[in-house]
């Protein structure tokens, strides 16, 4: 493992109350965002808000930028454009079903991309009921992932460790959701996929710290060290590894943000935020929660 830091002795848990206060603010912000989403006051994508979906086939490859330019000229600026598995097909999603919008899109594409022979293959209306069901399914997916984390950590470690990991994961998901709400970013299925990916990343980061804590618990002689001191020691020991892992993953997410195209832009942004928040929570949220649930007494074996 690459070492970018020497031996450190930082009192991370000495700052636990400040960190937990900051984390509570982020969680509250995320919960507020959930209520706003439920009330339909957030920037919801077509999958959640309902709208119109058009699948268009071309005779030649077409870029999203070309289609975006054509739609902008036609006054359609809020369309969500996605590439399909074949480079000759695209998907256009619109939140609002304006009268004659399908004809407007077809006319604009045929006039500006005549050589590529655009043809609307299918049109799907996404009604409010489908949007509500999608919201419920997305919430269920997040809750199921959280429950899985709780069970996995409880089996691998101890129950209070599972609470710490679950709180840290919940914290990360709520923080990213809250930030996206503040930035007025679109909440869609791609974003939900990012949240589930963040949950998995957060768990991996936390398990690295917990694994070192468990390892050190087996090495420390009875009555020679408090649990807080042992946790600080463990976090410092894996700090370099945590930073290297986070930076490596972050570089990939940043590259995706700048070069991944329009469709993956918000996914990459969510991942960048999730990596930063997840690294923070594995140090300042998961371990302090475990410490607060247990007793900061001399270790007994």
Curated annotation (Swiss-Prot):
One Gene Ontology molecular-function label: protein-transporting ATPase activity
Entry keyword set: Cell inner membrane, Cell membrane, Membrane, Protein transport, Translocation, Transmembrane, Transmembrane helix, Transport
GO biological process: intracellular protein transmembrane transport; protein targeting; protein transport; protein transport by the Sec complex
One cellular-component annotation, GO: plasma membrane
Coiled coil regions, renumbered to chain: none
Membrane topology listed for this record: Multi-pass membrane protein
Cell location: Cell inner membrane
InterPro entries: SecD/SecF_arch_bac, SecD/SecF_bac, SecD/SecF_CS, SecD_SecF_C, SecD_SecF_C_bact, SecF_bac
Record-annotated membrane-spanning stretches: 17-37, 137-157, 163-183, 190-210, 239-261, 272-292
Entry keyword annotation includes Coiled coil: no
Domain of life: Bacteria
Gene3D superfamilies for this protein: Multidrug efflux transporter AcrB transmembrane domain
Subunit-structure text: Forms a complex with SecD. Part of the essential Sec protein translocation apparatus which comprises SecA, SecYEG and auxiliary proteins SecDF. Other proteins may also be involved.
Main function: Part of the Sec protein translocase complex. Interacts with the SecYEG preprotein conducting channel. SecDF uses the proton motive force (PMF) to complete protein translocation after the ATP-dependent function of SecA.
Similarity comment: Belongs to the SecD/SecF family. SecF subfamily.
NCBIfam families noted in UniProt: 2A0604s01, transloc_SecF
PANTHER family membership: PROTEIN TRANSLOCASE SUBUNIT SECF, PROTEIN-EXPORT MEMBRANE PROTEIN SEC
Protein known as: Protein translocase subunit SecF
Organism, as annotated: Thermodesulfovibrio yellowstonii (strain ATCC 51303 / DSM 11347 / YP87)
